[in-house]
């Protein structure tokens, strides 16, 4: 056994300049595992709770309480534990916290230790993280969903939907997918520049232009960039949307005026689903995330029955990487895919359980970053380890996003002939 002899947390900064937590786990052999924890801007009501300090420092967003919880309470319980006992490590922390949403010790504190322990274990064995977690069957490179236009809570653009993503489904490899995606990104910059629009980027590296025509203007602009790059819109490149509908759900209605002003419409649940179906019939949209509000189960059911047979419907705020909510969705036939965010649930063990439950039920899974990221690229390894087949980790800019893509390039190179890139096969038919 390789025993944990030291656990140390510190406060660092994420890509938005907000504090976050980083944890080191050290074994008796002097092997280090280090993990930094991400943070979201649009967070689901049912997510595990990250612990923030409050007060004036860092506008209340400090994480020194979470750091202290790791360095005192958690460390004292885990020192002497084998670093290979991942399930036990996570269970001890869950029991220590004692709340359903990890609000006592903080999901950020618990997750930092959970991921750092896994990294230390992998390093002890001299294995890459994806191989340690996924074993010999971990060989699927995820298809990237590249977020090239940002709206909603991720930018100041007057568009309700949070993300407009391109998917290089005709790529033969992850490397080629990156080439296609980055070329389109740079062509989009020129298209926007030629229209006199801003080419500043949002939290996830996508552009945040003031597109007066709203959603369809964004889609048409992407179409032009795809064609300008020499690719076929609707064949080489498909589209994914993250509506983040909970962000503009007001008094039981989908209120687009929150982000789009007087030009925005107010829709009922059925009207919202019908609108998404209309968009999916007009444009090559093969994936829609959070098209309905997180607790609008009836709306989700209607949407799933309407287009779930041909469109991937991803539950993010709906499922929050939580097996309890996912189990309900599966039993009621709601959505057909789960977004996977490690900090929504707070431990590696629970993340793996959610992905396994989804796959066993025939749901697809999409590994995902958060809008507040760091240079940590753990989710790249997790996407391969769990054979997710898809990943959301931002646009082709900002090193906090590119670090994940670069790690996947390394993994594909390492796997060589064993690497499998599913392309369009990764998506729900």
Curated annotation (Swiss-Prot):
Presence of the UniProt keyword Magnesium in the record: yes
Pathway: Carbohydrate degradation; glycolysis; pyruvate from D-glyceraldehyde 3-phosphate: step 4/5
List of residues binding Mg(2+): 242, 289, 316
This enzyme's EC code(s): 4.2.1.11
Catalytic activity: (2R)-2-phosphoglycerate = phosphoenolpyruvate + H2O
Cofactor note: Binds a second Mg(2+) ion via substrate during catalysis.
Cofactor: Mg(2+)
GO cellular component labels: cell surface; extracellular region; phosphopyruvate hydratase complex
Active site residues per record: 204, 341
InterPro entries for the chain: Enolase, Enolase-like_C_sf, Enolase-like_N, Enolase_C, Enolase_CS, Enolase_N
Function statement: Catalyzes the reversible conversion of 2-phosphoglycerate (2-PG) into phosphoenolpyruvate (PEP). It is essential for the degradation of carbohydrates via glycolysis.
PANTHER family, A to Z: ENOLASE
Protein name: Enolase
Gene giving rise to this polypeptide: eno
